[in-house]
A protein has these predicted regions:
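Low-complexity, Gly/Ser/Thr/Pro-rich intrinsically disordered linker/tail segments
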Residues: 134, 144-214
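N-terminal capping segments
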Residues: 1-73
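Short, solvent-exposed loop/turn and secondary-structure capping segments
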Residues: 54-57, 118, 143
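Short acidic, gly/pro-rich beta-turn/loop elements at beta-sheet edges
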Residues: 129, 141-143
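...with weaker cross-activation on analogous glycine-rich loops/strands in unrelated enzymes
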Residues: 61-134
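Contiguous ligand/interfacial binding patches
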Residues: 138
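A broad, low-specificity signal marking well-ordered, structured residues that form hydrophobic/aromatic
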Residues: 12-14, 129, 151
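Feature targets compositionally biased, intrinsically disordered low-complexity regions
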Residues: 31-33, 58, 73, 88-91, ...
Length: 214
């Protein structure tokens, strides 16, 4: 059964503030191959929702750098998923900037009319929107300090989830346990991944195959 639940904005903000200037070892970092900003925002939204969507190609999930949905790391793909998602996972809509809330997502457009950068709102103070981002790393940076042609606000309205798979992921995301220290002689490649709950296979991708990585 598919039900709806609240998007926990404070958790998304707490995660964004913790990892704006450092990297969570659970996730690959895409700097140098397009940018890490949408990857970072996806992590933050996951912290507030704890539900991925494992539909191949069109879902929103991360298993490894080579097993992830385009929407996890691509600016336009992220937008397409969030505003069109009718299945499990977070979902939202575009709203005026005046209706923005903490935990919502902002995407910036350049002079070529391309949306190129993804940010997450962490505070609204006296009318000033503060954001966290990667590539360039920013912690509670005023939105007014960015240069852009236009922007869009993706308001996360809620989260759909399958009652068979209810997980509170926040603590394991926010403060992941350290892996055990293994002597070099005993180390083996750690490329095995847990399959998605629905059992569907996920085709491997190279980090650059999912389009714009920002």
């Amino acid at each position: 059964m598919i039900l709806k639940k609240e998007y926990l904005r404070e958790r998304a903000v707490a995660y964004a503030r913790k990892y704006a200037l450092v990297r969570n070892p659970l996730f690959y970092t895409f700097e140098g191959i397009g940018g890490n900003c949408t990857n970072f925002v996806s992590q933050s939204v996951l912290a507030g929702s704890c539900v991925m969507n494992f539909i191949p190609i069109y879902g929103w999930f991360y298993l490894s750098s080579n097993r992830r949905a385009p929407a996890w790391t691509g600016v336009q793909f992220f937008y397409n998923f969030m505003v069109n998602n009718l299945d499990v996972g977070p979902y939202g809509s575009v709203v005026p900037i005046e209706q923005a809330q903490i935990g919502d997502v902002i995407q910036l457009q350049n002079n070529d009319d391309v949306y190129y950068h993804t940010l997450i709102i962490t505070e609204i103070r006296d009318g000033e929107i503060l954001i966290c981002a990667n590539s360039v790393d920013s912690l509670d940076r005023p939105l007014s300090t960015y240069e852009y042609k236009s922007l869009r606000v993706i308001h996360i309205e809620g989260v759909r989830y399958d009652t068979r798979y209810v997980v509170d992921c926040f603590e394991s995301l926010y403060d992941p346990p350290l892996p055990p220290i293994t002597p070099p002689s005993e180390q083996t490649p750690s490329n095995e991944e847990v399959p998605p709950p629905n059992g569907e296979s996920i085709e491997e991708q190279t980090p650059s195959e999912t389009g714009e990585e920002e």
